[in-house]
Amino acid sequence: MKNKKALFIPLFIIILFIAFFNKIINFIINIKWFKEVNYLAVYFTKMRAIIILMIPIFIIFFISIWMYYKSLIINKNKSVVDIGLNKNNYGKKLFFIFNFIVSIFLAYIFSSSYWYRILQFNNSVDFNVKDPIFFKDVSFYIFKLPLFESLYKVIISLLLFLVITTFIAYFILEAKYKIQSRKDINLKNINYGIKSFAGKQLAIVSGLIILFISFGHLIKIWNLVYSSNGVSFGASYTDVHATLLFYKIIVVITLISSIVTLLSIVKGKFKPVSICIGITIFLIVSQNIASFLVQNFIVKSNEKTLEQPYIKNNIDLTRKAFALDDIEIRDFDIKNDLQKQDIADNKASIDNIRINSFKPTLEFYNQVQIIRYYYTFNDIDIDRYNINGKYNQVFLAAREIDTDALNPNTWQNRHLIYTHGFGAVMNKVNSVTSEGQPDFVIKDIPPYNKTNIKLTNPRIYFGEKTNDYVIVNTKINEFDYPREDSNKTNKYNGHAGIKMSFINRLLFAINKKDINFLLSKDIKKDSKIIINRNIVERAKKIAPFLTYDSDPYMVIYNGKIYWIIDAYTTTNRYPYSEPYDSINYIRNSAKVVIDSVDGDTNFYITDKKDPIVNNYAKTFKGLFKEEEDAPKEIREHFRYPKDLFSIQSKVLGKYHVKDPGVFYNGEDLWEVSKDQKHVEGETNTNDAPYIIMKLPDQNKEEMVLLNYFNVMKKDNMIALFGARMDGEQYGKKILYKLPSDKTVYSPYLFKQKINQDTNISKELSLWNREGSKVQYGDTIILPIKNSLLYIEPLYLRASGKNSIPEMKRVILSYNDKLVLSSSIQEGIKEIFNSKDNKINDKNEKDSTKTIDDSKLKKAQEYYNKAIEAQKNGDWTKYGENINELGNILNSIK
């Protein structure tokens, strides 16, 4: 028997090890990886918190269960129920083991579930904003109330569980006793049996349940700030004047009832307990009836007047929660009185008008610049660079390896050879080639670079498509990039990766379920495995509590490619703030910068005023760095994120209204303008463009994220909403309100204006014939002083699966003028009736000569193409090129 007991503990440990084997392996690998990326302390924050919490919670559970058990044992000796445990210590030992296991299990479940809320509670940071009903700082609702709610749910659940298990234990032991004594089970004596077995214990538990019902209603009081019963989010008139009153009464009555219950137990009287429970139930029912009566017989007929203070609370706090309370609001009185000098003064804005559009450009990149089938461009980013001394807006994209496209897709190819992407492409947004394609300033492999931007190490080991692990510094050379005669190879010289010792090879073989880690003869001791290479997943693994933007973007700095990911702090706990997309508070409080070669991942705090990110910084020490610690050249490329701007625009459509009466009437609602991508195509919500512009009253151009607003369910544009991002202006928002008594064309109305123009419509119909299709580019509405300039690139796509859209024309509109032109410059000249190609250029003669030379060169290109088409018998192409030649010759007359 002793030998069996001696074997039990080792056997139990072995079973536990087998059951948690994969988790143990994963835990070891996580330690190695977090150590490699220098965030081991962040990883251990959770573990340390769980262990520290488990110890006192285990002691509380263990002692509480043991004391409850002991009290039942004492009652057992006075009861008819004989559980047979007093004759030896076996039952006590068995219960001790049971109690130990249950207490550890419950302590672990509680600690692993609520460690984060407890740390949030301990590291609470004030918002310095108080709710208007209970005058508590917002931090109470975000950092403290969630813990109170969790504790309430856990304790109530445990108390109810205790009641249920007590009844179950009684019935089991009673049945056992009856069977052993061969007596019949008498259901009539159950009431007496329960009282004698656990009457006082159950009464105490009932008193505690009533006590926590009181606490639960106190939580309900605080949760009134999230009420959705009124016309706006947050506590309404009925909530404050009826529901709140009854909740307070219930809190007091249930608190008294819990005390009465405990005193009644001591005196052995149970009638007062029944009375207290009855009163509590009556009050809960009465609260619902009273709230219904107040809402329907007092509020309903006077709602606008009675609800105004609460609507104002909702407006003020929603605007604060979504960072809309600091918007600079200006009237934009459209005069359309631009002169040539105004055009000259805004030359940089006009020179940066985007005629390349996202989707067609990405298609072109993926057909012309992937070089080999195993490369891909995941998406296109837009940014601003000083190129050869000029401030330019550009498109750029990283050329990544698409491992799913490899052929053959072997383990060596996927993980040892094709380890990284190579290079980037860049084109200015404002220029195209004579064929209507993006005009590259960086392209090809190895990079052909016409800029002053250095790109000396263009390898991409970490990116948006790098979803697999790779093993570097093996006996096989890594593929670097293709050449005509042979492939260029490379050895990884970065510091990322975990050394592949035999133990680590074994660990990863188990973790990845791949025997190749052990069988491969190419892996050396100095080889390293690089895991978690997807930049978003990498950031999430380090800081899973942040929300990440859907569009990471690349930056070229110090000869390498870096990735920037916007990280958000969000909550749905901000009082009185109306939820949008399941959140009612958001800040872009951090930027994540990731090195594409070394994988260095840095989190920079960009909003020091945000209490949530400061709470994270206190909780996860060593995670965040100051924004000033980021290189200046990286900071210059920080963008105002589109995901944040999108949700702010959605909220602003309703919450630009500050007057509660107007808000109640719903008479001034906005929505983001609609747009149309195809002639006679479906309409979609306009995608806010990043544009280079000079804001009114500013003396230099800057990059601005701009959205266009319509009146709800109308197409007339009513406002322009912009977010600034250059230098010290970063994060400043401005709202231009357009005159409501004028028809201001939105992107959609602009498209309708184009379709209704007989000359342009005729051209579009001609191009949109069978075999080709016209599609619109990205609509830009550019404010210049007190005027609006509309720009619409036109793309022509030939039939065929792999056809590439070409930017053939630009439509410009100003005031009542609408022109179809081959370029922005030509369109501006036509609108303002100037014969100069560059308006107000001081060196008019030289600039005209330069432009004439460039046009003559284009004319020669079209002439050569026309002759070539004539030789091939392609008369359609011949006609197109002759038309283009004619346009150019007409423009330089």
Curated annotation (Swiss-Prot):
HAMAP family according to UniProt: UPF0182
Cell location: Cell membrane
Protein's recorded name: UPF0182 protein CLD_0809
SS bond list: none
Membrane topology: Multi-pass membrane protein
Organism: Clostridium botulinum (strain Okra / Type B1)
TM region positions: 9-29, 49-69, 94-114, 154-174, 202-222, 246-266, 273-293
One Pfam family per UniProt: UPF0182
Family from the record: Belongs to the UPF0182 family.
Any one GO cellular component localisation term in the record: extracellular region
Alphabetical list of PANTHER family matching this protein: UPF0182 PROTEIN SLL1060
Keywords: Cell membrane, Membrane, Transmembrane, Transmembrane helix
